[in-house]
Amino acid sequence: MITTQEISQIRQQVRAWHAKGETVAFVPTMGNLHLGHITLIKEAVKRADHVVASIFVNPMQFGQNEDLDAYPRTLAADQQALSDAGAELLFTPTPEIIYPKGMEQQSFVEVPNISEQLCGASRPGHFRGVATVVCKLFNIVQPDIALFGRKDFQQLLVIETMVADLSMPIEIIGVDTIREASGLAMSSRNGYLSQDQKDRAATLKRTMDTMSAAIQQGESIQDVIQAGHSQLSEAGFRPDYLEVRSTSDLSPASSEDSSLVILAAAYMGDTRLIDNLCFTR
């Protein structure tokens, strides 16, 4: 696997592959990789002739009260894991390469409506940072397909909407959430949890399972959400939000909506965890 910080080297290699009629898949990450990321790479290997990954801890998507410097950097281990999974090219730019004029002077991409609720309400500017860096990475790599985990359902919808609205010739593929045996969604943030906190954090998935079953049995969504809040609080969570929305646009679920998603964000100690569960009724 080739690792480079050079935009020109990425473009040269991808152009060479495309000139042969070969397809390119792209998996952007922030590093500190776990099995969920590796699953994305392995799925990409199945779907394209070549796989490009990136590792960039994007300062634009971190809020003022979020410690960018504390995010784990594990480049050597990440390189080995990506290579073993089948990635051929790894882009590891610095903030100065991605934002040469600084973030304040950087042109940006903002997806309205979807970006402003749920995680967007709790983390103002977060999805502007996500959309901007993903747009820039897409322009650098020029992939045919790009893969993202469904664990961050809102992020996936933001990216799908951006690609559609801006007519980008890229197929976006969502890959199912990878979970630990307890049901806890795999996340780089799980490393911040003690074993006791990890055990209690598994309640997040169980709560969503209970909620989806209750809604499918005809219970009121508001009553189900209220019960879910109680279940999370009893496990030691501090819920940020717990909502039931339409999968198409994240609008509040109406009686006509059949394709629904439960979206949750909650703090276990100082660690903010997110998860979601899609279901039909």
From Swiss-Prot:
* InterPro entries in alphabetical order: Cyt_trans-like (IPR004821), Pantoate_ligase (IPR003721), Pantoate_ligase_C (IPR042176), Rossmann-like_a/b/a_fold (IPR014729)
Q: Write out the residues that bind (R)-pantoate.
A: 61, 155
User: Looking at the keywords, is ATP-binding present?
Assistant: yes
Where's it found, cell-wise?
A: Cytoplasm
What does it catalyze?
A: (R)-pantoate + beta-alanine + ATP = (R)-pantothenate + AMP + diphosphate + H(+)
Q: Which residues form the active site?
A: 37 (proton donor)
What are the UniProt keywords, alphabetically? ATP-binding, Cytoplasm, Ligase, Nucleotide-binding, Pantothenate biosynthesis
Its pathway, per UniProt, is: Cofactor biosynthesis; (R)-pantothenate biosynthesis; (R)-pantothenate from (R)-pantoate and beta-alanine: step 1/1
- Could you state one GO cellular component term attached to this entry? cytosol
Q: What class of enzyme is it?
A: ligase
List positions binding ATP.
30-37, 149-152, 178, 186-189
What's this chain's function? Catalyzes the condensation of pantoate with beta-alanine in an ATP-dependent reaction via a pantoyl-adenylate intermediate.
Q: How does it assemble?
A: Homodimer.
Give the protein name, as stated in the record: Pantothenate synthetase
Q: Which organism is it from?
A: Shewanella sediminis (strain HAW-EB3)
Name the encoding gene, please. panC
